[in-house]
Amino acid sequence: MSGAPPSYSFVALPPRAKDGLVVFGKNSARPRDEVQEVVYFPAVDHDAESKVECTYISIDQVPRTHAIVISRPAWLWGAEMGANEHGVCIANEAINAREPAAETEALLGMDLVRLGLERGTTAKEALDIIVSLLDEHGQGGNYYEDAHSCHSFQSAYLLVDRDEAWVLETVGKYWAAERITEGVRCICNHLSLATKLDEEHPELRTYAQSQGWWTGDDEFNFAQVFSPADDRLDCCAGQDSLEKQEESITVQTMINILRDKASGVCIDSESFLTTASIVSVLPQNRSSPCIHYFTGTPDPSRSIFKPFIFVDDVKLVPKAQSPCFGDDDPAKKEPRFQEKPDRRHELYKAHEWARAVIESDEEQGRTLRKTMLELEKQGLEAMDEILSSPEPPDPAEVGDLFYDCVDTEMKFFK
């Protein structure tokens, strides 16, 4: 088992967020060569007693799944981060804990992100669904597309809706959760929940005592009890990035935080890279739509955040989706990952050209980046107009919003 790469998920709620908005963001730090895709799945009614095939195992399907949009490593079923039609956003962090994560194939933390989005109408309902599935099926299996080594982790989640956020941290089937109703919060690759636990597994403390990790005499501190002895519990650079913001936090603020390499929030190392990013704005006024911005490409400092709004007729974006290999996918065969197919989608390939220009040609790179940021700015301003309008947007005008943004970006790269 290797250490989890530095990865950060954020939320800002009023009064720290601007104009009665909840702002959510995440950088997904993954192996450098891994491709993430952005995929929309409509709401679906399912047959009774049907199954859903997750990354490694199949579980019982529910009668109806909600419409979702997710950013995910292209080889797996679940999601690193995403949102659903009810304004629920979930992000996952891989964490190391005192108890090693199981290598036995079960549900991945990323599967639980997607399952929570497909089945939950609020952040709390999604949390309840995740811990129920965790208890029934467990978590385990390889987090990376790697035939030579199994990289298994415990999982933490940030679950957000228009009203509140929840931090959920899990160790095996055991878990603890904290409700956040105001201010800012960041989670990273370390257990962060301390003594304020709003909900927990009914046997959490008994289990800790049985392992000799807690005597029962002193106050129960979840992170101290379940973290490895050498873990630094105070090293979440992302929390500092949020707390030092003097102005109200906006979508642009969150984007700037995600692009910050100096703080370590945007990772670009020999082994790992921020392979995709998301920012969502959830208005507490329910007459305004939630807006979700995805990059679909690596390194947010060299990517464009493109908006998505849920409507009944969303136009699919195949240019941001990886090739499908069906049952021949090496991730679905056992032994797994014996081959590594080319999972790059069209947007990813176009973005590779842009990255090469930025890295190799200083003048052309500056010009290219300036134009990219201008394109992004136009999108942000158009979305601000939608949020400030007393009327909901015309579904016909926003159903192809993400499609048009991807198309414009690719034409520009060409």
Swiss-Prot record:
InterPro entries for the chain: Peptidase_C69
Subcellular localization: Cytoplasm
Keywords associated with the record: Cytoplasm, Exocytosis
GO biological process terms held by the UniProt record: exocytosis; proteolysis; regulation of synaptic vesicle cycle
Record field: transmembrane: none
Pfam families xrefs: Peptidase_C69 (PF03577)
GO cellular component: cytoplasm; nuclear membrane; presynapse
Gene Ontology molecular functions: cysteine-type exopeptidase activity; dipeptidase activity
PANTHER family according to UniProt: SECERNIN (PTHR12994), SECERNIN-1 (PTHR12994:SF7)
Note: 'Secern' is an archaic English term meaning 'secrete'.
Family: Belongs to the peptidase C69 family. Secernin subfamily.
Function field: Regulates exocytosis in mast cells. Increases both the extent of secretion and the sensitivity of mast cells to stimulation with calcium.
Designated name of the protein: Secernin-1
Species of provenance: Mus musculus
Phylogenetic lineage: Eukaryota, Metazoa, Chordata, Craniata, Vertebrata
